Structure formats: structure tokens, C-alpha cells
From Swiss-Prot:
Sorted UniProt keywords: Cholesterol metabolism, Endoplasmic reticulum, Lipid metabolism, Lipid transport, Membrane, Steroid metabolism, Sterol metabolism, Transmembrane, Transmembrane helix, Transport
Membrane topology type: Multi-pass membrane protein
Tissue specificity: Ubiquitous. Highly expressed in lung.
Keyword Lipid metabolism in record: yes
Effect of disrupting the coding gene: Mice show an increase in the abundance of type 1 oxidative muscle fibers in the diaphragm. Female mice show also an increase in the abundance of type 1 muscle fibers in the extensor digitorum longus. Conditional knockout in neurons leads to decreased body mass; male show reduced white adipose tissue mass while female show reduced perigonadal fat mass. Show also abnormal circling behavior and severe seizures.
Protein task: Plays a role as a mediator in the endoplasmic reticulum (ER) cholesterol and bile acid homeostasis. Participates in sterol transport out of the ER and distribution into plasma membranes.
A Pfam entry, by short name: Arv1
BP term (GO), one: intracellular sterol transport
Protein's UniProt keywords contain Signal: no
InterPro entries noted in UniProt: Arv1
One Gene Ontology cellular component annotation held by this UniProt entry: endoplasmic reticulum membrane
Name used for this protein in its record: Protein ARV1
Length: 266
């Protein structure tokens, strides 16, 4: 999730160029969330001056001078300022790739748990084909559960928005924020590779971390309070749990490998 230096910012040549920034290209102050026309001004010969927010009188985005590692650490700590920098003041187009990789990680975890709990006397070719098919199946199930989680969030916001008389949230930005904030699922692979007695606990902690990151992404994107953000995430988790229950029943009816869901953490 980290971004580096001045990546994703725009500035004109000199003071006049910076002042002529289009009003449609707005940034956000990472401290007070007010809109800003620019992040810094490039006067000449690389002399830069960070723009001061007119509302809070603090730098609009101090992270444009920070190292990507520092930004990533602050994002891991779920700092609001780091999330605003990443979501509003940078241009990151890895949402789809990151989502796909996270789904592969989750599918691998489920596939690994399934293979670890099942033994078959069938020939090697049959076992190899069955294992490959199981991985594809786990990927599809993980995709459905992820889609259910996102659908639950969007459905709750769609129902709740008319009640609050607020403007409709930017669902595209929220989708990108949720996909980016799910980067914690990448930790599933190290947890499986370096297996030990505390692996089940690690998997649960990863799940909690991902949900916490989703909560912070919702809170920053919608600029709302903690209570509503928590309800939004819980709505997505509820619909995801319903889909998990559906797959449990389906697996129980059509095959005998439903023990996978009993032993897995997600």
C-alpha cells in the first residue's frame, strides 16, 4: 500500500503553473480532510514548498516527502493520515492485481488445509488432477465470499444513505479502498510456509487485521464516524458468513469434504 515520495502529485512549472491547477483535480488535506488544489509548489530548480491547508493551517500532505517504507508502516498502523494520502493524493492502479493475488493466497490456504486433512489411495494421476481441481474450486469459493463481503457493504450503504440525507458515497473509490486495504491477506502465504503450533492463531490475527484495515478504509473514504464504519464492515461480514454457510450446506450435500470449513479460519 505504500507509495513513494511525490508519486501521484501534480504541479505546474513555477508559482503560476501551480496556481492554475484545474479545480476538477482536487486533493485532500490528510489532517482535516478538506479539499486542496495542490500538494506543493515547484518554484524553480527543484525548490519545492509544501502547500499549507487553509482550514487547519497544517501541511496538506506531509507524506509526499516521506519514504515509501515509512508510509507503509503508517498504513499498517492504520493511521488516518496515511490512508488519506494513499486514497486521495496518489494514483495507484494495482487494485485489481492485488485483489487477484489476495484471492490466490486465500485459495492456496484453503487448498493446503484440504490436502493436509485428506488422504486418498487413488493413483497418482487421479490425485494430481483432483488436487488441481480442488485449488480451482477453492479459488471460486474465495471469490464468491469476497464478492459477498463487498456486496453486503454496498447494500448497507445504499439502504442507509436516504435515511441520513447525505450525498451518495463514491462507490468506485470505496471499492478501490476496500481492495487495497485487504493487503493483509498476503500474510497468509508466510503463515502457511512457516507452519508451527501458533499457525491457527496467526490466521485469526490476520483476519482481524484485514477487517481492521477495511474498517479504516471505510471510515476514511466516507469521512464518517467509527460507529457507522463498524456497522458497514459488519454488514459485509454478515453476508459473507451467509455465503460461507451456504457453501457448507452445499458441500455437505454433494460431497464429504465439508470438514474443510470446520477446520479453516476464514
Amino acid at each position: 500500500m505504500g507509495t513513494g515520495g511525490r508519486r501521484g502529485t501534480r504541479s505546474g512549472k513555477g508559482t503560476e503553473g501551480a496556481a492554475a491547477t484545474s479545480s476538477s483535480c482536487l486533493y485532500r488535506c490528510i489532517e482535516c480532510n478538506r479539499e486542496a488544489q495542490e500538494l506543493y509548489r515547484d518554484y524553480s530548480h527543484g525548490v519545492l514548498k509544501i502547500t499549507i491547508c487553509k482550514s487547519c493551517q497544517k501541511p496538506v500532505d506531509k507524506y509526499i516527502e516521506y519514504d515509501p517504507v515509512i508510509i507503509l508502516i503508517n498504513a499498517i498502523l492504520c493511521k488516518t493520515q496515511a490512508y488519506r494520502h494513499i486514497l486521495f493524493n496518489t494514483k495507484i492502479n494495482i487494485h485489481g492485481k492485488l485483489c487477484m493475488f489476495c484471492l490466490l493466497c486465500e485459495a492456496y490456504l484453503r487448498w493446503w488445509q484440504l490436502q493436509d486433512s485428506s488422504q486418498s489411495p487413488a493413483p497418482d494421476d487421479v490425485i494430481r488432477y483432483a488436487k488441481e481441481w480442488d485449488f480451482y474450486r477453492m479459488f471460486v469459493i474465495a471469490s464468491f465470499e469476497q464478492a459477498a463481503f463487498l456486496t453486503g457493504i454496498f447494500a448497507f450503504l445504499w439502504v442507509q444513505q436516504p435515511m441520513t440525507a447525505k450525498r451518495a458515497p463514491d462507490f468506485v473509490l470505496l471499492l478501490k479502498a476496500l481492495l487495497l486495504s485487504s493487503y493483509g491477506k498476503l500474510l497468509l502465504i508466510p503463515a502457511v510456509i512457516w507452519e508451527h503450533d501458533y499457525t491457527p492463531l496467526c490466521l485469526r490475527l490476520i483476519k482481524v487485521f484485514v477487517l481492521t484495515s477495511n474498517f479504516q478504509a471505510v471510515r476514511v473514504t466516507l469521512n464518517t464516524n467509527r460507529r457507522l464504519s463498524l456497522l458497514v464492515v459488519l454488514s459485509g461480514l454478515l453476508l459473507e458468513s451467509i455465503v460461507v454457510f451456504f457453501f457448507q450446506r452445499m458441500e455437505w450435500d454433494v460431497s464429504s469434504d465439508c470438514a474443510l470449513y470446520k477446520s479453516q479460519d476464514f
